[in-house]
Amino acid sequence: MNYKAHYIGGRWIEGQGESITKFSPIDQQVLWQANSADASQVRAACHAAREAFYAWSHLPASERIKVIQTFAALLNEEKETLARVISQETSKPLWETRTEIQSMIGKAAISIEAWEQRTGESETIMPDGRALLRHRPHGVMAVFGPYNFPGHLPNGHIIPALIAGNTLVFKPSELTPMTAEETVKLWEKAGLPAGVLNLVQGARSTGTALLEDKQIDGVLFTGSANTGFHFHRMLGGQPEKMLALEMGGNNALIVDAYDDIDAAVYTIVQSAFISAGQRCTCARRLLVKNGAHGDAVIKRLVEVTERIVPSHWDAQPQPFIGGVISLQAVQNLLEAQDRLQKLGGISLVSLEQCQPQSTLLTPGIIDVSQVADVPDEEYFGPLLMLMRYDTFDEALAIANNTRFGLATGLISPDAALFQRLSEDARAGIVNWNKPLTGASSKAPFGGIGASGNYRPSAYYAADYCAWPMASLVADELTLPETLAPGLHFPD
Protein backbone atom coordinates (compact mmCIF):
# COMPACT_ATOMS: atom_id res chain seq x y z
CA MET A 1 0.00 0.00 0.00
CA ASN A 2 1.38 3.39 -1.02
CA TYR A 3 -0.56 6.59 -0.95
CA LYS A 4 0.04 10.31 -0.81
CA ALA A 5 1.59 10.64 2.63
CA HIS A 6 3.83 13.66 2.00
CA TYR A 7 2.86 17.30 1.66
CA ILE A 8 5.35 19.26 -0.45
CA GLY A 9 4.76 22.65 -2.01
CA GLY A 10 1.04 22.49 -1.36
CA ARG A 11 0.54 19.04 -2.94
CA TRP A 12 0.06 15.59 -1.40
CA ILE A 13 2.37 13.12 -3.12
CA GLU A 14 3.45 9.49 -2.88
CA GLY A 15 6.81 8.64 -1.38
CA GLN A 16 9.67 7.24 -3.43
CA GLY A 17 11.70 5.80 -0.56
CA GLU A 18 11.53 2.63 1.49
CA SER A 19 8.22 1.35 2.82
CA ILE A 20 7.29 2.21 6.40
CA THR A 21 4.51 0.59 8.39
CA LYS A 22 2.82 1.76 11.56
CA PHE A 23 1.53 -1.03 13.80
CA SER A 24 -0.98 -0.67 16.61
CA PRO A 25 0.89 -0.85 19.94
CA ILE A 26 -2.01 -2.79 21.43
CA ASP A 27 -2.34 -5.69 18.99
CA GLN A 28 0.20 -5.10 16.17
CA GLN A 29 -2.48 -4.61 13.53
CA VAL A 30 -1.37 -2.44 10.60
CA LEU A 31 -2.68 1.10 11.05
CA TRP A 32 -0.82 2.94 8.28
CA GLN A 33 1.59 2.12 5.50
CA ALA A 34 3.34 4.21 2.88
CA ASN A 35 6.64 4.78 1.17
CA SER A 36 8.93 7.24 2.91
CA ALA A 37 10.22 10.42 1.31
CA ASP A 38 13.56 9.86 -0.41
CA ALA A 39 16.43 12.35 -0.57
CA SER A 40 15.15 14.01 -3.74
CA GLN A 41 11.73 14.59 -2.18
CA VAL A 42 13.32 16.03 0.95
CA ARG A 43 15.27 18.43 -1.28
CA ALA A 44 12.03 19.35 -3.03
CA ALA A 45 10.38 20.07 0.33
CA CYS A 46 13.28 22.31 1.39
CA HIS A 47 13.17 24.09 -1.96
CA ALA A 48 9.42 24.65 -1.62
CA ALA A 49 9.96 26.13 1.83
CA ARG A 50 12.69 28.42 0.48
CA GLU A 51 10.48 29.58 -2.37
CA ALA A 52 7.65 30.37 0.05
CA PHE A 53 9.82 32.17 2.61
CA TYR A 54 9.94 35.68 1.16
CA ALA A 55 6.18 36.08 0.75
CA TRP A 56 5.35 34.50 4.12
CA SER A 57 7.96 36.44 6.08
CA HIS A 58 6.88 39.73 4.48
CA LEU A 59 3.23 39.28 5.33
CA PRO A 60 2.16 41.52 8.21
CA ALA A 61 2.41 39.53 11.44
CA SER A 62 -1.31 40.08 11.92
CA GLU A 63 -1.99 38.12 8.72
CA ARG A 64 0.21 35.22 9.80
CA ILE A 65 -1.50 35.20 13.18
CA LYS A 66 -4.92 34.97 11.49
CA VAL A 67 -3.87 31.67 9.91
CA ILE A 68 -2.64 30.36 13.27
CA GLN A 69 -5.94 31.33 14.91
CA THR A 70 -7.90 29.62 12.14
CA PHE A 71 -5.84 26.47 12.69
CA ALA A 72 -6.62 26.58 16.42
CA ALA A 73 -10.33 26.92 15.65
CA LEU A 74 -10.18 23.91 13.32
CA LEU A 75 -8.38 21.93 16.01
CA ASN A 76 -11.23 22.70 18.36
CA GLU A 77 -13.74 21.44 15.78
CA GLU A 78 -11.79 18.23 15.13
CA LYS A 79 -10.45 17.65 18.64
CA GLU A 80 -12.21 14.34 19.26
CA THR A 81 -11.19 12.93 15.88
CA LEU A 82 -7.55 13.88 16.36
CA ALA A 83 -7.53 12.65 19.96
CA ARG A 84 -8.64 9.23 18.75
CA VAL A 85 -5.93 9.20 16.08
CA ILE A 86 -3.25 9.95 18.68
CA SER A 87 -4.65 7.26 20.98
CA GLN A 88 -4.68 4.73 18.16
CA GLU A 89 -1.03 5.13 17.31
CA THR A 90 0.40 5.77 20.79
CA SER A 91 -2.07 3.68 22.85
CA LYS A 92 -2.45 6.55 25.32
CA PRO A 93 -5.93 6.59 26.89
CA LEU A 94 -8.47 8.98 25.40
CA TRP A 95 -8.64 11.06 28.57
CA GLU A 96 -4.98 11.91 28.07
CA THR A 97 -4.99 12.56 24.33
CA ARG A 98 -7.97 14.87 24.78
CA THR A 99 -5.83 16.97 27.10
CA GLU A 100 -3.06 16.91 24.48
CA ILE A 101 -5.40 18.46 21.92
CA GLN A 102 -6.43 21.14 24.41
CA SER A 103 -2.75 21.96 24.88
CA MET A 104 -2.36 22.26 21.11
CA ILE A 105 -5.31 24.65 20.93
CA GLY A 106 -4.00 26.75 23.80
CA LYS A 107 -0.55 26.95 22.20
CA ALA A 108 -1.82 29.44 19.62
CA ALA A 109 -2.78 32.19 22.07
CA ILE A 110 0.20 31.64 24.36
CA SER A 111 2.63 31.70 21.41
CA ILE A 112 1.19 34.96 20.13
CA GLU A 113 1.63 36.47 23.59
CA ALA A 114 5.18 35.14 23.88
CA TRP A 115 6.10 36.47 20.44
CA GLU A 116 4.85 39.93 21.36
CA GLN A 117 6.60 39.96 24.74
CA ARG A 118 9.90 38.32 23.85
CA THR A 119 10.51 39.07 20.17
CA GLY A 120 8.30 41.95 19.20
CA GLU A 121 9.49 45.43 18.28
CA SER A 122 10.57 48.20 20.65
CA GLU A 123 11.88 51.74 20.38
CA THR A 124 14.03 53.82 22.74
CA ILE A 125 14.30 57.59 22.29
CA MET A 126 17.87 58.90 22.41
CA PRO A 127 19.20 62.49 22.42
CA ASP A 128 20.25 62.30 18.78
CA GLY A 129 17.87 59.69 17.37
CA ARG A 130 16.22 56.41 18.23
CA ALA A 131 17.28 52.85 19.04
CA LEU A 132 15.10 50.17 17.45
CA LEU A 133 14.89 46.49 18.28
CA ARG A 134 13.24 44.19 15.78
CA HIS A 135 13.32 40.45 15.19
CA ARG A 136 13.66 38.58 11.93
CA PRO A 137 12.91 34.93 11.04
CA HIS A 138 15.75 32.52 10.39
CA GLY A 139 14.36 31.21 7.10
CA VAL A 140 13.74 27.53 6.42
CA MET A 141 13.59 25.44 9.58
CA ALA A 142 13.39 21.68 10.04
CA VAL A 143 11.08 20.40 12.77
CA PHE A 144 11.68 16.90 14.13
CA GLY A 145 8.79 15.58 16.20
CA PRO A 146 8.75 12.84 18.87
CA TYR A 147 6.26 10.02 19.30
CA ASN A 148 5.20 10.55 22.92
CA PHE A 149 3.26 13.76 22.23
CA PRO A 150 2.99 13.61 18.44
CA GLY A 151 0.53 16.50 18.30
CA HIS A 152 1.51 18.84 21.12
CA LEU A 153 5.31 18.82 20.96
CA PRO A 154 5.78 19.47 17.21
CA ASN A 155 3.00 22.03 17.53
CA GLY A 156 5.11 23.80 20.15
CA HIS A 157 7.78 24.37 17.50
CA ILE A 158 5.57 24.88 14.45
CA ILE A 159 3.30 27.64 15.76
CA PRO A 160 6.05 29.93 17.15
CA ALA A 161 8.15 29.40 14.03
CA LEU A 162 5.27 30.32 11.73
CA ILE A 163 4.33 33.40 13.77
CA ALA A 164 7.93 34.61 13.46
CA GLY A 165 7.78 34.24 9.66
CA ASN A 166 9.78 31.05 9.10
CA THR A 167 8.84 28.34 6.63
CA LEU A 168 9.11 24.71 7.68
CA VAL A 169 9.84 21.13 6.74
CA PHE A 170 8.31 18.78 9.31
CA LYS A 171 9.67 15.26 9.82
CA PRO A 172 7.59 13.45 12.46
CA SER A 173 8.55 10.25 14.20
CA GLU A 174 8.01 7.24 11.95
CA LEU A 175 6.10 5.75 14.91
CA THR A 176 3.37 8.42 14.72
CA PRO A 177 2.80 9.27 11.05
CA MET A 178 -0.99 9.47 11.27
CA THR A 179 -1.08 12.32 13.77
CA ALA A 180 1.32 14.35 11.64
CA GLU A 181 -0.70 13.76 8.49
CA GLU A 182 -4.00 14.76 10.08
CA THR A 183 -2.45 17.85 11.67
CA VAL A 184 -0.95 19.07 8.39
CA LYS A 185 -4.34 18.59 6.71
CA LEU A 186 -5.77 21.04 9.24
CA TRP A 187 -3.01 23.55 8.44
CA GLU A 188 -3.85 23.19 4.76
CA LYS A 189 -7.53 23.76 5.51
CA ALA A 190 -6.62 26.80 7.63
CA GLY A 191 -5.28 28.50 4.51
CA LEU A 192 -1.55 28.21 5.07
CA PRO A 193 0.07 29.13 1.73
CA ALA A 194 1.72 26.39 -0.32
CA GLY A 195 5.30 25.68 0.70
CA VAL A 196 5.10 27.33 4.11
CA LEU A 197 4.72 23.98 5.88
CA ASN A 198 5.92 20.78 4.23
CA LEU A 199 5.61 17.23 5.56
CA VAL A 200 8.10 14.44 4.84
CA GLN A 201 7.44 11.04 6.40
CA GLY A 202 10.16 8.50 7.01
CA ALA A 203 12.76 7.06 9.32
CA ARG A 204 16.49 7.68 9.70
CA SER A 205 17.37 8.13 6.02
CA THR A 206 14.67 10.78 5.60
CA GLY A 207 15.84 12.61 8.70
CA THR A 208 19.47 12.49 7.61
CA ALA A 209 18.60 13.93 4.21
CA LEU A 210 16.74 16.77 5.91
CA LEU A 211 19.61 17.55 8.30
CA GLU A 212 22.11 17.58 5.45
CA ASP A 213 20.13 19.85 3.15
CA LYS A 214 21.90 23.17 2.54
CA GLN A 215 18.59 25.05 2.43
CA ILE A 216 17.99 24.46 6.15
CA ASP A 217 18.71 27.48 8.37
CA GLY A 218 17.68 25.92 11.67
CA VAL A 219 16.67 22.65 13.34
CA LEU A 220 14.08 22.28 16.09
CA PHE A 221 14.27 18.87 17.76
CA THR A 222 12.47 17.09 20.57
CA GLY A 223 13.49 13.52 21.32
CA SER A 224 16.09 11.26 22.91
CA ALA A 225 19.54 12.37 24.01
CA ASN A 226 21.21 9.87 21.68
CA THR A 227 19.46 11.31 18.64
CA GLY A 228 20.00 14.87 19.80
CA PHE A 229 23.72 14.25 20.25
CA HIS A 230 23.81 12.78 16.73
CA PHE A 231 22.18 15.94 15.37
CA HIS A 232 24.69 18.09 17.25
CA ARG A 233 27.59 16.17 15.71
CA MET A 234 26.11 16.36 12.22
CA LEU A 235 25.74 20.13 12.46
CA GLY A 236 29.14 20.64 14.09
CA GLY A 237 31.11 23.40 12.42
CA GLN A 238 27.94 25.06 11.10
CA PRO A 239 27.30 27.90 13.57
CA GLU A 240 25.14 29.63 10.99
CA LYS A 241 22.44 27.01 11.61
CA MET A 242 20.24 27.52 14.67
CA LEU A 243 19.89 24.27 16.64
CA ALA A 244 17.39 23.83 19.47
CA LEU A 245 17.57 20.48 21.28
CA GLU A 246 15.00 19.36 23.86
CA MET A 247 16.03 15.94 25.07
CA GLY A 248 15.34 13.56 27.92
CA GLY A 249 16.34 13.27 31.55
CA ASN A 250 17.25 10.94 34.38
CA ASN A 251 14.99 12.92 36.67
CA ALA A 252 15.03 12.63 40.45
CA LEU A 253 12.05 13.14 42.78
CA ILE A 254 13.05 13.61 46.43
CA VAL A 255 10.54 12.57 49.11
CA ASP A 256 10.99 14.09 52.56
CA ALA A 257 8.67 13.46 55.51
CA TYR A 258 5.08 14.33 54.52
CA ASP A 259 2.06 13.62 56.72
CA ASP A 260 -0.41 12.90 53.91
CA ILE A 261 1.15 9.74 52.55
CA ASP A 262 -1.58 9.14 49.97
CA ALA A 263 -1.10 12.64 48.56
CA ALA A 264 2.63 11.97 48.33
CA VAL A 265 2.09 8.62 46.61
CA TYR A 266 -0.38 10.15 44.16
CA THR A 267 2.23 12.74 43.20
CA ILE A 268 4.88 10.03 42.81
CA VAL A 269 2.64 7.95 40.55
CA GLN A 270 1.75 10.99 38.44
CA SER A 271 5.45 11.78 38.17
CA ALA A 272 6.68 8.30 37.30
CA PHE A 273 3.97 6.40 35.46
CA ILE A 274 1.70 8.82 33.61
CA SER A 275 1.82 8.24 29.83
CA ALA A 276 3.29 4.82 30.70
CA GLY A 277 6.43 6.66 31.79
CA GLN A 278 6.93 8.14 28.33
CA ARG A 279 7.29 11.80 29.21
CA CYS A 280 10.74 13.33 29.18
CA THR A 281 10.05 14.84 32.61
CA CYS A 282 8.92 11.57 34.22
CA ALA A 283 10.65 10.66 37.47
CA ARG A 284 13.21 7.93 36.79
CA ARG A 285 14.76 7.99 40.27
CA LEU A 286 12.74 8.17 43.48
CA LEU A 287 14.76 9.31 46.49
CA VAL A 288 13.06 8.39 49.78
CA LYS A 289 14.42 9.26 53.22
CA ASN A 290 15.42 6.36 55.44
CA GLY A 291 13.19 5.73 58.44
CA ALA A 292 9.69 4.62 59.37
CA HIS A 293 7.97 7.38 57.40
CA GLY A 294 9.90 6.54 54.25
CA ASP A 295 9.09 2.86 54.73
CA ALA A 296 5.39 3.73 54.95
CA VAL A 297 5.57 5.78 51.74
CA ILE A 298 7.21 2.91 49.88
CA LYS A 299 4.73 0.35 51.23
CA ARG A 300 1.80 2.47 50.07
CA LEU A 301 3.43 3.19 46.71
CA VAL A 302 3.86 -0.54 46.09
CA GLU A 303 0.20 -1.17 46.98
CA VAL A 304 -1.02 1.53 44.58
CA THR A 305 1.37 0.57 41.77
CA GLU A 306 0.32 -3.08 41.90
CA ARG A 307 -3.25 -1.96 41.25
CA ILE A 308 -2.45 0.00 38.09
CA VAL A 309 -3.86 -2.02 35.20
CA PRO A 310 -2.83 -0.88 31.70
CA SER A 311 -5.58 -1.27 29.14
CA HIS A 312 -6.87 -0.35 25.70
CA TRP A 313 -7.00 3.36 24.92
CA ASP A 314 -10.81 3.45 24.62
CA ALA A 315 -11.62 0.98 27.41
CA GLN A 316 -14.39 1.88 29.84
CA PRO A 317 -13.76 2.80 32.54
CA GLN A 318 -10.66 4.55 31.29
CA PRO A 319 -7.30 3.17 32.47
CA PHE A 320 -4.57 5.35 33.97
CA ILE A 321 -2.11 4.18 31.31
CA GLY A 322 -2.03 2.38 28.01
CA GLY A 323 1.01 0.73 26.50
CA VAL A 324 4.43 1.93 25.42
CA ILE A 325 5.02 2.87 21.81
CA SER A 326 6.38 -0.38 20.33
CA LEU A 327 7.44 -3.97 20.95
CA GLN A 328 11.05 -2.80 20.70
CA ALA A 329 10.38 -0.38 23.56
CA VAL A 330 8.96 -3.29 25.58
CA GLN A 331 12.10 -5.31 24.95
CA ASN A 332 14.37 -2.41 25.89
CA LEU A 333 12.58 -1.89 29.21
CA LEU A 334 12.53 -5.57 30.14
CA GLU A 335 16.25 -5.78 29.39
CA ALA A 336 16.91 -2.66 31.48
CA GLN A 337 15.09 -4.21 34.43
CA ASP A 338 17.09 -7.41 34.01
CA ARG A 339 20.39 -5.50 33.94
CA LEU A 340 19.50 -3.59 37.11
CA GLN A 341 18.57 -6.83 38.86
CA LYS A 342 21.90 -8.38 37.89
CA LEU A 343 23.67 -5.34 39.36
CA GLY A 344 21.94 -6.02 42.68
CA GLY A 345 18.66 -4.17 42.27
CA ILE A 346 15.64 -5.65 44.07
CA SER A 347 12.29 -5.50 42.28
CA LEU A 348 9.53 -4.34 44.62
CA VAL A 349 7.04 -4.43 41.76
CA SER A 350 8.05 -6.25 38.61
CA LEU A 351 7.63 -4.60 35.23
CA GLU A 352 5.92 -7.24 33.09
CA GLN A 353 4.45 -7.53 29.62
CA CYS A 354 0.73 -8.16 30.01
CA GLN A 355 0.41 -10.35 26.92
CA PRO A 356 2.52 -11.33 23.90
CA GLN A 357 2.44 -8.99 20.90
CA SER A 358 1.15 -6.15 23.06
CA THR A 359 2.97 -3.16 24.48
CA LEU A 360 0.89 -3.07 27.66
CA LEU A 361 3.31 -3.16 30.60
CA THR A 362 2.63 -3.23 34.31
CA PRO A 363 4.67 -0.49 36.03
CA GLY A 364 7.83 -1.58 37.81
CA ILE A 365 9.70 -0.33 40.89
CA ILE A 366 13.24 -1.52 41.55
CA ASP A 367 15.27 -0.68 44.66
CA VAL A 368 18.82 0.17 43.58
CA SER A 369 19.94 1.61 46.92
CA GLN A 370 22.63 -1.06 47.28
CA VAL A 371 23.84 -0.87 43.68
CA ALA A 372 27.33 0.62 43.62
CA ASP A 373 27.21 2.18 40.16
CA VAL A 374 23.68 2.80 38.95
CA PRO A 375 23.73 3.46 35.19
CA ASP A 376 22.99 7.09 34.33
CA GLU A 377 20.39 6.24 31.70
CA GLU A 378 16.89 7.36 30.84
CA TYR A 379 14.63 4.30 30.87
CA PHE A 380 11.77 5.64 28.80
CA GLY A 381 8.83 3.79 30.25
CA PRO A 382 7.10 2.80 33.52
CA LEU A 383 10.24 1.68 35.36
CA LEU A 384 11.11 3.59 38.54
CA MET A 385 14.39 3.24 40.42
CA LEU A 386 14.19 3.65 44.21
CA MET A 387 17.09 5.08 46.21
CA ARG A 388 17.18 5.68 49.97
CA TYR A 389 19.03 8.54 51.67
CA ASP A 390 19.75 9.82 55.18
CA THR A 391 20.27 13.58 54.84
CA PHE A 392 19.05 16.20 52.42
CA ASP A 393 22.65 16.93 51.43
CA GLU A 394 22.94 13.30 50.38
CA ALA A 395 19.66 13.46 48.45
CA LEU A 396 20.76 16.60 46.64
CA ALA A 397 24.07 15.01 45.69
CA ILE A 398 22.27 11.93 44.32
CA ALA A 399 19.80 14.07 42.37
CA ASN A 400 22.61 16.04 40.73
CA ASN A 401 24.70 12.95 40.01
CA THR A 402 23.63 12.71 36.38
CA ARG A 403 24.78 13.97 33.01
CA PHE A 404 21.19 15.06 32.39
CA GLY A 405 19.54 18.17 33.78
CA LEU A 406 15.89 18.32 32.80
CA ALA A 407 13.70 18.01 35.91
CA THR A 408 13.88 17.42 39.63
CA GLY A 409 11.40 17.88 42.43
CA LEU A 410 10.68 17.72 46.13
CA ILE A 411 7.77 16.42 48.19
CA SER A 412 8.09 18.08 51.59
CA PRO A 413 6.29 20.54 53.89
CA ASP A 414 9.59 22.36 54.43
CA ALA A 415 9.93 25.49 52.28
CA ALA A 416 13.55 25.87 53.35
CA LEU A 417 14.40 22.54 51.70
CA PHE A 418 12.81 23.67 48.46
CA GLN A 419 14.80 26.89 48.65
CA ARG A 420 17.97 24.84 48.91
CA LEU A 421 16.91 22.61 46.04
CA SER A 422 16.10 25.56 43.79
CA GLU A 423 19.51 27.08 44.56
CA ASP A 424 21.59 23.94 44.04
CA ALA A 425 19.68 21.72 41.59
CA ARG A 426 21.14 21.25 38.13
CA ALA A 427 17.85 21.14 36.24
CA GLY A 428 15.74 23.41 34.10
CA ILE A 429 12.51 22.37 35.85
CA VAL A 430 12.40 22.23 39.67
CA ASN A 431 8.99 21.51 41.24
CA TRP A 432 7.78 21.47 44.84
CA ASN A 433 4.82 19.32 45.95
CA LYS A 434 3.78 19.02 42.30
CA PRO A 435 4.38 16.19 39.82
CA LEU A 436 7.59 16.41 37.81
CA THR A 437 5.44 16.02 34.72
CA GLY A 438 3.61 19.28 35.38
CA ALA A 439 4.70 22.43 33.55
CA SER A 440 3.31 25.90 32.93
CA SER A 441 2.72 27.17 29.40
CA LYS A 442 3.79 30.60 30.67
CA ALA A 443 7.28 29.32 31.53
CA PRO A 444 10.23 28.02 29.51
CA PHE A 445 10.57 24.25 29.14
CA GLY A 446 13.98 22.67 28.82
CA GLY A 447 17.06 21.44 30.58
CA ILE A 448 20.82 21.63 30.77
CA GLY A 449 23.60 19.10 30.37
CA ALA A 450 22.57 16.14 28.23
CA SER A 451 18.95 17.35 28.35
CA GLY A 452 19.37 20.29 26.01
CA ASN A 453 21.56 23.03 24.59
CA TYR A 454 20.09 26.03 26.40
CA ARG A 455 17.29 26.55 23.92
CA PRO A 456 14.20 25.99 26.10
CA SER A 457 10.85 25.64 24.39
CA ALA A 458 7.29 26.53 25.52
CA TYR A 459 7.12 30.26 26.37
CA TYR A 460 10.74 30.77 25.26
CA ALA A 461 10.27 29.07 21.87
CA ALA A 462 9.89 32.52 20.34
CA ASP A 463 13.54 33.18 21.20
CA TYR A 464 14.93 30.49 18.90
CA CYS A 465 12.49 31.21 16.08
CA ALA A 466 13.85 34.69 15.34
CA TRP A 467 17.08 36.64 15.58
CA PRO A 468 17.37 40.18 16.96
CA MET A 469 18.16 43.17 14.75
CA ALA A 470 19.34 46.32 16.54
CA SER A 471 19.26 49.69 14.76
CA LEU A 472 20.28 53.26 15.51
CA VAL A 473 18.22 55.66 13.40
CA ALA A 474 17.72 59.38 12.85
CA ASP A 475 15.13 61.00 10.62
CA GLU A 476 17.66 63.60 9.48
CA LEU A 477 21.42 63.61 9.10
CA THR A 478 23.16 66.67 10.61
CA LEU A 479 26.73 67.61 11.28
CA PRO A 480 27.36 67.51 15.05
CA GLU A 481 28.29 70.73 16.79
CA THR A 482 31.38 69.09 18.29
CA LEU A 483 33.50 67.16 15.83
CA ALA A 484 35.64 64.14 16.66
CA PRO A 485 39.27 64.98 17.49
CA GLY A 486 41.48 65.43 14.44
CA LEU A 487 38.64 66.16 12.01
CA HIS A 488 38.35 69.57 10.31
CA PHE A 489 35.69 70.81 7.91
CA PRO A 490 37.09 74.11 6.54
CA ASP A 491 34.67 76.82 5.44
Swiss-Prot record:
Catalytic activity of the protein: N-succinyl-L-glutamate 5-semialdehyde + NAD(+) + H2O = N-succinyl-L-glutamate + NADH + 2 H(+)
Class of the enzyme per the UniProt entry, highest EC level? oxidoreductase
Positions binding NAD(+) in this chain are G223, S224, A225, N226, T227, G228
Pathway info: Amino-acid degradation; L-arginine degradation via AST pathway; L-glutamate and succinate from L-arginine: step 4/5
Q: Which SUPFAM superfamilies match?
A: ALDH-like
So which domain of life are we looking at? Bacteria
Which Enzyme Commission numbers does its entry carry? Answer: 1.2.1.71
What job does this protein perform?
A: Catalyzes the NAD-dependent reduction of succinylglutamate semialdehyde into succinylglutamate.
Q: Of which family is this protein a member?
A: Belongs to the aldehyde dehydrogenase family. AstD subfamily.
Q: Which HAMAP family match?
A: Aldedh_AstD
**Protein name from the UniProt record:** N-succinylglutamate 5-semialdehyde dehydrogenase
Q: Which organism is it from?
A: Photorhabdus laumondii subsp. laumondii (strain DSM 15139 / CIP 105565 / TT01)
